[in-house]
């Protein structure tokens, strides 16, 4: 008995792994950028930091997954956008620190290697990298029979970006009187899906709920997370932004205070928040308290910017999209976020 056959009998298909690598090469090639060294398949991905032209470089890293949104991708057998979610969760955190994403690595673990499915997954990762301007320089697909079911998989990513030391965004520049500008989310993004799945547990996904404006439920639930790099990076380069909040798990209540010092607070005008239809549907069909929605979801704002009043018009000018003036920074009295 050959070693290959013995391994196959244990549930690991080495040939399928090789096929995945061949299938994803064309997707990885789309993400090429200046600074990438070496080719896919080496023991480690390499990047030449000098190619960025940054004078005082500070590396900023982030890692994340997509939570139980993966379970809906598996349920609806749609795998070509979940990779973008994974990239977005990592690079949006990096941009919130003022850094430009440079490269990304992904990790997929599964019970049975399916080359067609995982090509779809990596195609989504590559699309996310293209949108973020990051190179996909490495990754791992681990076949783990017994750990996962044959149709199950998990997905995680790791991103590294660079910032000029003087342009780092760490909350120290945010001050009382700053204006809070919201950039629209594309949907639920990648948080709160344990609750989302409970609310819609008995739905097929093909439903046309009146709140969803003619879209099938499954398409709305799997709408990929928006990547904010192209929008935010020019603002960072012009040093127009005092603080950035990536609105992820914990919604407004948990994430907005991460933008500023402990003696400040955010006053949010709820009427100016562009609440998306899916959040109205979740509140209605899930019987969720209205105030709790802001503790869980992004409510239609995926990225929040703290901007000095004199810079607001310039920021709006640079952003080729609707910009929502949803609040301001105030002195903290009790709560770090006050929703009016």
Swiss-Prot record:
Record key words, sorted: ATP-binding, Cytoplasm, Ligase, Nucleotide-binding, Purine biosynthesis
| Matching SUPFAM superfamilies | PurM C-terminal domain-like (SSF56042), PurM N-terminal domain-like (SSF55326)
> Which chemical reaction does it catalyze?
2-formamido-N(1)-(5-O-phospho-beta-D-ribosyl)acetamidine + ATP = 5-amino-1-(5-phospho-beta-D-ribosyl)imidazole + ADP + phosphate + H(+)
Q: Where in the cell is it found?
A: Cytoplasm
Q: Which InterPro entries does the entry mention?
A: PurM-like_C_dom, PurM-like_C_sf, PurM-like_N, PurM-like_N_sf, PurM_cligase
Share an example GO biological-process annotation for this protein: 'de novo' IMP biosynthetic process
**CDD domains referenced in this protein's UniProt entry, alphabetically:** PurM
Q: Which GO terms describe its cellular component?
A: cytosol
The domain of life is: Bacteria
Where does this protein have coiled-coil stretches?
none
Molecular-function annotations in GO: ATP binding; phosphoribosylamine-glycine ligase activity; phosphoribosylformylglycinamidine cyclo-ligase activity
EC identifiers of the protein:
6.3.3.1
What broad class of enzyme is this?
Answer: ligase
Q: Which family does it belong to?
A: Belongs to the AIR synthase family.
For this protein, the record's NCBIfam families field holds: purM
The protein in question is named Phosphoribosylformylglycinamidine cyclo-ligase
Species of origin reads: Streptococcus pyogenes serotype M28 (strain MGAS6180)
Q: Tell me the name of the encoding gene.
A: purM
């Amino acid at each position: 008995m050959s070693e290959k056959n013995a391994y196959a009998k244990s549930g690991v298909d080495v040939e399928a792994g090789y096929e995945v690598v061949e299938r994803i090469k064309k997707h990885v090639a789309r993400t090429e950028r200046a600074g990438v060294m070496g080719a896919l398949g080496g023991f480690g991905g390499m990047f030449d930091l000098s190619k960025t032209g940054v004078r005082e470089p500070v590396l900023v890293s982030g890692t994340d997954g997509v939570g139980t949104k993966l379970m809906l991708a598996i349920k609806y057998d749609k795998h070509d956008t979940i990779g973008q979610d994974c990239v977005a969760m990592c690079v949006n955190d990096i941009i919130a620190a003022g850094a430009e994403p440079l490269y990304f690595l992904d990790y997929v673990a599964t019970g049975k290697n399916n080359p067609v499915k995982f090509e779809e997954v990596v195609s989504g990762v590559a699309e996310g990298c293209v949108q973020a301007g990051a190179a996909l320089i490495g990754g791992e697909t681990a076949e783990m029979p017994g750990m996962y079911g044959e149709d199950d998989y998990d997905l995680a990513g790791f991103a590294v970006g660079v910032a000029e030391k003087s342009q780092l965004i760490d909350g120290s520049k945010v001050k009382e009187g700053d204006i809070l500008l919201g950039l629209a989310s594309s949907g639920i993004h990648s948080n709160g899906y344990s609750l989302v799945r409970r609310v819609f547990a008995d739905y097929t996904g093909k439903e046309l709920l009146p709140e969803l404006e003619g879209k099938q439920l499954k398409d709305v639930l799997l709408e990929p997370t928006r990547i904010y790099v192209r929008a935010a990076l020019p603002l960072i380069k012009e040093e127009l932004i005092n603080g950035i909040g990536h609105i992820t798990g914990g919604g407004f209540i948990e994430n907005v205070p991460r933008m500023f010092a402990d003696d400040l607070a955010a006053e949010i005008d709820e009427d100016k928040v562009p609440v998306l239809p899916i959040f109205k549907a979740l509140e209605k069909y899930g019987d969720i308290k209205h105030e709790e929605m802001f503790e869980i979801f992004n409510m239609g704002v995926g990225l929040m910017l703290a901007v000095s009043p004199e810079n607001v018009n310039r920021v709006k000018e640079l952003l080729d999209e609707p910009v929502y003036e949803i609040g301001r920074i105030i002195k903290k009295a009790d709560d770090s976020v006050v929703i009016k």
